[in-house]
Amino acid sequence: MERCVRVKSWVEENRASFQPPVCNKLMHREQLKIMFVGGPNTRKDYHIEEGEEVFYQLEGDMVLRVLEQGEHRDVVIRQGEIFLLPARVPHSPQRFANTMGLVIERRRMETELDGLRYYVGDTEDVLFEKWFHCKDLGTQLAPIIQEFFHSEQYRTGKPNPDQLLKEPPFPLSTRSVMEPMSLKAWLESHSRELQAGTSLSLFGDSYETQVIAHGQGSSKGPRQDVDVWLWQLEGSSKVTMGGQCVALAPDDSLLVPAGFSYMWERAQGSVALSVTQDPACKKPLG
């Protein structure tokens, strides 16, 4: 049986890991990657992946620089706000001192590639890029960044066409990027439905990511090919899995590994989230 992890306590215990130059630490590294990221860390590179990313700011604000439909823009994610980044959107996180954010992404499929790009100023022109199968982003990015800093492209600010792909592995997304929203305000506005036993999706069904808010009641999580991350925000609940039971108090979290079914009983006044990212639900290109 997986043990529950109290989020804020875990962050405090690992506070030293969130200082430069590393700035991040994984709570879970299975099919779901549950990562917490500190700062400061300002970047010029843009990351591109075929999956989606969930951002939530626990402490302070951050800026996520994105290339959206051909235009560079800054998405400000403030403390307490949650945000879902669509797949195939170039993005560059800008983090500041004394901040802490949660990032959730998934293990890549064997057929998927990640990209790291530098652009010429605020244009769509690619200055430098590398494409790779991502197994450990924390260790794979640093050598690519160092390669760029020692490159002729960095020195001259001009791309080398011979080192750029004629066609990228996949087209960039044409979706509009949503605005971040206050998680607390969203939950409060739906409290009546949640406490009546209705579970609600924060982002709808047009993404492979499902962030579901749950109030009081019980539900059975079927055996899935993906992990499920549970985060108890208010009240209490009880999870039974593999014949064992674990109690969740406010701010406790629990990872249900792929291949396990579970029963989740939530007491009156309970508010909790469940998060899944299923690549089998990848949406058509767009």
UniProtKB/Swiss-Prot annotation:
O2 binds at residue 43. It catalyses: 3-hydroxyanthranilate + O2 = (2Z,4Z)-2-amino-3-carboxymuconate 6-semialdehyde. It is an enzyme of class 1 (oxidoreductase). Its cofactor is Fe(2+). GO terms for biological process: 'de novo' NAD biosynthetic process from L-tryptophan; anthranilate metabolic process; L-tryptophan catabolic process; NAD biosynthetic process; neuron cellular homeostasis; quinolinate biosynthetic process; quinolinate metabolic process; response to cadmium ion. InterPro entries: 3hydroanth_dOase, 3hydroanth_dOase_met, RmlC-like_jellyroll, RmlC_Cupin_sf. GO terms for molecular function: 3-hydroxyanthranilate 3,4-dioxygenase activity; ferrous iron binding; iron ion binding; oxygen binding. Residues 161-177 are annotated as: Linker. Fe cation binds at residues 47, 53, 91. GO terms for cellular component: cytoplasm; cytosol; mitochondrial membrane. Substrate binds at residues 53, 95, 105. It is found in: Cytoplasm, Cytosol. Disulfide bonds: none annotated. Residues 178-286 are annotated as: Domain B. Residues 1-160 are annotated as: Domain A (catalytic). Its EC number is 1.13.11.6. It holds the Pfam family 3-HAO. Keywords: Cytoplasm, Dioxygenase, Iron, Metal-binding, Oxidoreductase, Pyridine nucleotide biosynthesis. Pathway: Cofactor biosynthesis; NAD(+) biosynthesis; quinolinate from L-kynurenine: step 3/3. Catalyzes the oxidative ring opening of 3-hydroxyanthranilate to 2-amino-3-carboxymuconate semialdehyde, which spontaneously cyclizes to quinolinate. Monomer. Belongs to the 3-HAO family. This is 3-hydroxyanthranilate 3,4-dioxygenase.
